[in-house]
């Protein structure tokens, strides 16, 4: 096997996002539910026996040292393999959206190279490597919708009685993006949310809680407010995902997207029960 084609890297939505406190080192303590959706980037990876790591963009340009290449190099460093890879990335998930596109690309890269290079690492080992690159990467490696706490390191799959109902969502990405650091450094950010429970979330699901980053984001980026109003005018209840600037709403009825403002992107998405590559790494090392 020398090439892996059409590898999906799905986006996520934060169904709610609360901040319950702050650690002495300054990191915020979060509670959230991460949900996979079928808005995906696509990767194609070819084996390079010379040990080099290269990347080719099909679409919007990315920095040369993006999370895909960093993930590949981190996997090389962790295992000592002398194999390399050429990564072709087809971007579809918007950047600066709060949808985890870069983290998902990195997770798919780790899963694919673990297979292509014949490393045989289990999911726990891959998660350790992923966490060194970004807090959201372990979630995508787990490959299941999850309740997430702490700084992102506590991940509890929502399965069985807590599984998310199958539903359809519309996701809107305004033209403007947002810088995560500017939101978390804002003095007006709510940092004392009451701790939520999984049972409380399960009683309300898509109507539960709020995104405490949203008020700050709306101040920094008025297009977030405009996107929420655009969906509300169509009779849907909208909120922001992650640190924005994308917003989303559960589709309780069909809507038209023909009047989407110039420069915005919108997509109707289904939630996913499992990451398409969820079976590519064993749960135990």
From Swiss-Prot:
Pathway: Isoprenoid biosynthesis; isopentenyl diphosphate biosynthesis via DXP pathway; isopentenyl diphosphate from 1-deoxy-D-xylulose 5-phosphate: step 3/6
Alphabetical UniProt keywords: ATP-binding, Isoprene biosynthesis, Kinase, Nucleotide-binding, Transferase
Reactions the enzyme catalyzes: 4-CDP-2-C-methyl-D-erythritol + ATP = 4-CDP-2-C-methyl-D-erythritol 2-phosphate + ADP + H(+)
Top EC class, one word: transferase
EC number: 2.7.1.148
Record GO biological process: isopentenyl diphosphate biosynthetic process, methylerythritol 4-phosphate pathway; terpenoid biosynthetic process
Keyword Transmembrane helix belongs to the record: no
GO molecular function, one term: 4-(cytidine 5'-diphospho)-2-C-methyl-D-erythritol kinase activity
Similarity field: Belongs to the GHMP kinase family. IspE subfamily.
Name of this chain's protein: 4-diphosphocytidyl-2-C-methyl-D-erythritol kinase
Organism: Paracidovorax citrulli (strain AAC00-1)
Organism lineage string: Bacteria, Pseudomonadati, Pseudomonadota, Betaproteobacteria, Burkholderiales
